[in-house]
Amino acid sequence: MAVYYTSNVGCYQQEPIFLNHQQQNQQASSSSAAASFTVTGGDTVRNEMVFIPPTTTGDVVTGNGTVSSSDLSFHDGQGLSLSLGTQISVAPFHFHQYQLGFTSQNPSISVKETSPFHVDEMSVKSKEMILLGQSDPSSGYAGNGGNGFYNNYRYNETSGGFMSSVLRSRYLKPAQNLLDEVVSVKKELNQMGKKKMKVNDFNSGSKEIEGGGGELSSDSNGKSIELSTIEREELQNKKNKLLTMVDEVDKRYNQYYHQMEALASSFEIVAGLGSAKPYTSVALNRISRHFRALRDAIKEQIQIVREKLGEKGGESLDEQQGERIPRLRYLDQRLRQQRALHQQLGMVRPAWRPQRGLPENSVSVLRAWLFEHFLHPYPKESEKIMLAKQTGLSKNQVANWFINARVRLWKPMIEEMYKEEFGDESELLISKSSQEPNSTNQEDSSSQQQQQQENNNNSNLAYSSADTTNIVFSSETKPDRVLGNDNDPQQQQINRSSDYDTLMNYHGFGVDDYRYISGSNQQESRFSNSHHLHDFVV
């Protein structure tokens, strides 16, 4: 037998109330007396219900007081509902039972006897009704125009006082409103359901109009056909832009999601695994709703444009593929324009080509080491190994880079620095060094000219001495010279001129061919000799 007693209300003696007839028959048939379980009134007792097991067998329960039958309310088909004399009005909060730990002390207690299978079915139905925002008749909560009361028999005995204080708190409703604003998706789901209902009503109305009279459909089809090519192109471009906007929204949402995951992982590394989930889940739900609303708005515009163009929904794969072809062309054109613009501004690298040389990161590390050791850019073996580890290159690659850098980069810089500091002196040295070979060349040329003059003088002397003997490169005597008069000055002048002609004509022939022309009869005679001219010069 189960009896309920109160603690802080006016107590008076009354007959106990039985939950079913079986317990009443057991109490009537039993003869053994037992002690009655009572709760004395006072402020020291907690303001909650105490469930007393059926142990009394007497006809009358004695005590300070029992609960009156007026405090117990039996709803038709709703189970037992008990209050302490006051109803707690709270804002509708559909997840008290599941989130705050409200559990039934004895779910099988009811006006009717229920099996455990029936209890499971009732619990499933109550969960579904709570998720749908409706009041569960079998639960302790009954919705009364947005307000309701919770039966305290649903609370745990250990947390009843705390829960009652929470439910009576003045901060409960603002907290519920804040959570509904940030997390709850119920309003938007209801709005989406209303939109779907409107769309279905519109579609059904349009179908009725098409079935009733074909004039409107023909007019609408005629309007879609009567579109000019310019208008059709404009609508097509608009549709392509809207489709690209949908792709951009999806891309941005994925980007946001990945960034949030990266941030959460970095936070969990510091704070612990799963510590970022309470923060990120709310933000993800909120942002996903914004993205979804934007995407739905763009989709509605696309649907309007399709209706203007007279296109269908494009559910089949062929139609979707036909839509993607012009959209891909548009995207390709846009990407090319952006790529050209970025290349002009220098924001993006050109297209990929086979890499020549080392990676830029490695080169930057090696160049930094070179400038740090600019006075002596010759790394040791240990330094080469260290640089190879830092750059991800091999030791030979590092050594080859430093060889090339010293030749192409370091040496020209040293030369420029030397020119800047010692530019005047180096120019003087260079001018002096350039003048010295010129002076030596001039001296050599002057000495050669002097030797040529001496040789010419000697040759003239040789030929002048030959005039006295009347023999020049020949063993035979010339009749003209023998018969001539030596005392005649005119004859002597002719002989000298002929000798000079022979000397001048010598330079026009080979080394071994010499020509002698007599001054008197101009007879030409040739002869060959193996001796050179300088052999005959004394």
Curated annotation (Swiss-Prot):
Pfam families registered for this protein in UniProt: Homeobox_KN (PF05920), POX (PF07526)
Skewed-composition ranges (Low complexity): 438-460
Compartment(s): Nucleus
Classification via Gene3D superfamilies: Homeodomain-like (1.10.10.60)
Feature: compositional bias, Polar residues: 461-476, 487-497
Residue ranges, annotated region (BELL domain): 231-302
GO CC entries: nucleus
Region (Disordered) residue spans: 201-223, 434-500
A single GO molecular function term of this UniProt record: DNA-binding transcription factor activity
Outcome of substituting E233D: In strain: cv. Ag-0, cv. Bs-1, cv. Chi-1, cv. Cvi-0, cv. Kas-1, cv. Ita-0, cv. Landsberg erecta, cv. Lisse, cv. Me-0, cv. Mt-0, cv. Oy-0
Annotated keywords: DNA-binding, Homeobox, Nucleus, Transcription, Transcription regulation
DNA-binding region: 351-413
SMART domains: HOX, POX
Main location: nucleus
Residue segments, region SR/KY domain: 169-185
Subunit field text: Interacts with TLP1. May form heterodimeric complexes with TALE/KNOX proteins. Interacts with OFP1, OFP2, OFP4 and OFP5.
Record family assignment: Belongs to the TALE/BELL homeobox family.
Domain remark text: The SR/KY and BELL domains are responsive for the interaction between the TALE/BELL proteins and the TALE/KNOX proteins.
Protein name: BEL1-like homeodomain protein 10
Species this chain originates from: Arabidopsis thaliana
The organism's taxonomic lineage, starting at the top: Eukaryota, Viridiplantae, Streptophyta, Embryophyta, Tracheophyta
